[in-house]
Structures are given as C-alpha cells and as structure tokens.
C-alpha cells in the first residue's frame, strides 16, 4: 500500500490537498447553526440515492405512474422505506435550506465580498423549491394532479405572456401526459444538473472566502 500511495503522492501531491482540507481555520464564533448548509447537502445526497433507486420502478405515464408507486410501496423489498426516506428527506431539505438562508442573512453572510456566494445560494434555494414542486406531482394521484394544475395555472394572470407560459409549462392547454413528462424530466435531469453546477460553485466560494466573522 505504501508504494501505491507514494506513486499517487508523487504525481498528485495528495498530502498537500489533505493538509489544505484539514487545516482550514474555523472562527471561534461558529456554532451548530453554521451546520445547516451541510445538513441541507446531506439531505440532497440522500435524495439522489433514494431517487435513483426509485427510477428503477417508477413509470412516468398518467396511466401507470400511480400504480408503479403503489407497486414500489407494497411489493418491492424495502420500497416503502426508500420512498418514505425520500419524502422525509425532501421535507427536511426544504426546512434546513430555509433555516440556512435565515442564518446567513441574520449574520450578514451576504455582504461584500460574499455577494456571489449569496447569489448562488439563492439559486440553489429556488432549485430546492422546484424539486419539491415537480416531485410532488410524480405519483399522479389526486393531490399531485391538482397541485400541478394550480401551480401551472398561476402564470395565467400575467398579461400577454400568461397563457403561452401556462401552455409551455403544461405542454398543452390542459394538464396531462405532456405535463407529467415535463415535470419528470425537470425533477430527474434538469434540476439535478443545475444543482450539480451551482452547488460546487457555492462550496468553492465558501472555501475560498472562509466563514464571515461575527456581527
């Protein structure tokens, strides 16, 4: 093992990277409330793992979506547990995100020179809420259907562009298969991809600038 490590160390300077990670200064005023962002990240990773597991059984069609969720909950080994963890972790992720935003705002973490960190954080907050909205509809039960109908109908109040925007969100004039396909694509591909872009940016900025001092 020593020879293998030496080969990697010679080429990649692993020890220098490890020292940089472990020797980062942590201000003395930091408390448990500064862990809310990390808890949000942990919830997101749980979401990725459990969501990936559910894609093996979920069928994104209006005729089979609800039945596939029922099958997952009643027939698949530990399927009920996987979906329950996914649902609980989703609620926890939204809650921790909200508390994290409040903590950052109240401690002045959005001020110069951390404006871009704040901007990426707000984008991640919007993505988190979008995950909740799109995921809520995927079982395609009565709650999910009417939630989608209400949410996608809100932009209709916007003058001129309201109706075209509603049709863009739904994929047609009414809520149906096109809507479910759009929400499934958003939930499982587009939103995770955007999160994978902005989350490293957010953490790298925090890593570079450090934790802000007390007010």
Swiss-Prot record:
One of its GO terms (molecular function) is metal ion binding. It is a multi-pass membrane protein. One of its GO terms (biological process) is photosynthesis. Keywords: Chloroplast, Electron transport, Heme, Iron, Membrane, Metal-binding, Photosynthesis, Plastid, Thylakoid, Transmembrane, Transmembrane helix, Transport. Heme b 1 binds at residues 100, 202. Heme b 2 binds at residues 86, 187. Its cofactor is heme b; heme c. Binds 2 heme b groups non-covalently with two histidine residues as axial ligands. Pfam families: Cytochrome_B. Heme c binds at residue 35. The chain crosses the membrane at residues 32-52, 90-110, 116-136, 186-206. Its main location: plastid. InterPro entries: Cyt_b/b6_N (IPR005797), Cyt_B6_PetB (IPR023530), Cytb/b6-like_sf (IPR027387), Cytochrome_b_N_euk/bac (IPR048259), Di-haem_cyt_TM (IPR016174). It is found in: Plastid, Chloroplast thylakoid membrane. It comes from the Eukaryota. GO terms for cellular component: chloroplast thylakoid membrane. The 4 large subunits of the cytochrome b6-f complex are cytochrome b6, subunit IV (17 kDa polypeptide, PetD), cytochrome f and the Rieske protein, while the 4 small subunits are PetG, PetL, PetM and PetN. The complex functions as a dimer. Component of the cytochrome b6-f complex, which mediates electron transfer between photosystem II (PSII) and photosystem I (PSI), cyclic electron flow around PSI, and state transitions. PANTHER family: CYTOCHROME B. Heme 1 (or BH or b566) is high-potential and absorbs at about 566 nm, and heme 2 (or BL or b562) is low-potential and absorbs at about 562 nm. Belongs to the cytochrome b family. PetB subfamily. This is Cytochrome b6. It comes from Pinus thunbergii (Japanese black pine).
């Amino acid at each position: 093992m020593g020879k293998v490590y030496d080969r990697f160390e010679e080429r990649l300077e692993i020890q220098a990277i490890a020292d940089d990670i472990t020797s980062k200064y942590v201000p003395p005023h930091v408390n448990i409330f500064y862990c809310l962002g990390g808890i949000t990240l942990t919830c997101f990773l749980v979401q990725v793992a459990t969501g990936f597991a559910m894609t093996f059984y979920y069928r994104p069609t209006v005729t089979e979506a609800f039945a596939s969720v029922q099958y997952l909950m009643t027939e698949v080994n530990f399927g009920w547990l996987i979906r329950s963890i996914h649902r609980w972790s989703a609620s926890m992720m939204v809650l921790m995100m909200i508390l994290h935003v409040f903590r950052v705002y109240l401690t002045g973490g959005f001020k110069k020179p951390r404006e871009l960190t704040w901007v990426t954080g707000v984008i991640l907050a919007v993505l988190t809420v979008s995950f909740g909205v799109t995921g809520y509809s995927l079982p395609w039960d009565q709650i999910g259907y009417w939630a989608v109908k209400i949410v996608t109908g809100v932009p209709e109040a916007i003058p001129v562009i309201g109706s075209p925007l509603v049709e863009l969100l739904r994929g047609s004039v009414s809520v149906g298969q096109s809507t479910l396909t759009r929400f499934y694509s958003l939930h499982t591909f587009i939103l995770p991809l955007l999160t994978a872009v902005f989350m490293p940016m957010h953490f790298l900025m925090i890593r570079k600038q450090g934790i802000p001092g007390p007010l």
